[in-house]
Amino acid sequence: MMLAQQWRDARPKVAGLHLDSGACSRQSFAVIDATTAHARHEAEVGGYVAAEAATPALDAGRAAVASLIGFAASDVVYTSGSNHAIDLLLSSWPGKRTLACLPGEYGPNLSAMAANGFQVRALPVDDDGRVLVDEASHELSAHPVALVHLTALASHRGIAQPAAELVEACHNAGIPVVIDAAQALGHLDCNVGADAVYSSSRKWLAGPRGVGVLAVRPELAERLQPRIPPSDWPIPMSVLEKLELGEHNAAARVGFSVAVGEHLAAGPTAVRERLAEVGRLSRQVLAEVDGWRVVEPVDQPTAITTLESTDGADPASVRSWLIAERGIVTTACELARAPFEMRTPVLRISPHVDVTVDELEQFAAALREAP
């Protein structure tokens, strides 16, 4: 439990019980201090001078992210979050705009796909929503698309996707793969050979809100056509420089760089193993709570556990009650989160490495008492 205690000791004391890292993890003292120090430096010397001074820290953040996903540091750009990243990528996509994704694709991602004129086709999946790689391979070979988009770990269901296997199958068919790693980065192994990967700071890496990353391999990047500035303008900027262009919160990016560094120092493999253990413990503790059904198989290697009500309880109302009456933070996932897969809303917990069995039992007891 050394990892769990170190993670907890590195942060402010929690007010209540935080089981919501899939929404927003708790930042460490070091992350908060780095973010604050940069903001103070902006006030002392000016925002642009401070940003120049922060270049080594920001470059270290790129390198740290790159090491987690198997890219070069020069392939990584900062964004304001995952939604921003997917829109940047899809709006720059050249040629035919067709893609295949999971039936349980994240609602905002589907919105970005539609807004950028993509025709979307569903990948074959099993009853748990896990992609069937062999079937997908046959379908994509017979009816290819311009790209495959895979959300490696959904926000409404804690099922780990076989990302590496799907990437290999797609590459055999000559199709590039984009990975949404918003829930996966810092949680699952994301070094899977994808052509592009994007993610958020605020979830399992426990960085500040309002920051994300997008990594694109050079072979794909050179084909992209960013909207701003127009490609025919005589401006000496690379594609990735164009993608990163725009106003941003430099202090938050510095804090994110520190957060990724902390994750590397803790050991990504150790963190993954502990989060898998957290998921198993959560499902075992919650399996006996009357009125709720645990959706995920107990051995899924993720820390996301979702609960379906079996007696008509409203997850959103239960979430509000848990916060107001017990100080327990969870997420209610409504149908819009995965509009083509979800049939009923769920209550989600996503504890980080520091959660204890006593805390999980405390949550289970509160759930039994919830109206």
Swiss-Prot record:
Keywords: Lyase, Pyridoxal phosphate
Organism the protein comes from: Mycolicibacterium smegmatis (strain ATCC 700084 / mc(2)155)
GO process annotations (BP): ergothioneine biosynthesis from histidine via gamma-glutamyl-hercynylcysteine sulfoxide
EC number: 4.4.-.-
Keyword flag Lyase: yes
Modified residues (N6-(pyridoxal phosphate)lysine): 203
Highest taxon in the source lineage: Bacteria
Role of this protein: Probably catalyzes the conversion of hercynylcysteine sulfoxide to ergothioneine. Ergothioneine is a secreted antioxidant that protects mycobacterium from oxidative stress.
InterPro entries, alphabetized: Aminotrans_V_dom (IPR000192), EgtE (IPR027563), PyrdxlP-dep_Trfase (IPR015424), PyrdxlP-dep_Trfase_major (IPR015421), PyrdxlP-dep_Trfase_small (IPR015422)
Cofactor: pyridoxal 5'-phosphate
Pfam families from the UniProt entry: Aminotran_5
Family: Belongs to the class-V pyridoxal-phosphate-dependent aminotransferase family. EgtE subfamily.
Catalysed reactions, as listed in the record: S-(hercyn-2-yl)-L-cysteine S-oxide + AH2 + H(+) = ergothioneine + pyruvate + A + NH4(+)
Biological pathway: Amino-acid biosynthesis; ergothioneine biosynthesis
Any one GO molecular function term: hercynylcysteine sulfoxide lyase activity (ergothioneine-forming)
Xref: PANTHER family: CYSTEINE DESULFURASE (PTHR43586), CYSTEINE DESULFURASE 1, CHLOROPLASTIC (PTHR43586:SF8)
Name of the protein this chain belongs to: Probable hercynylcysteine sulfoxide lyase
Enzyme class: lyase
Keyword set includes Lyase: yes
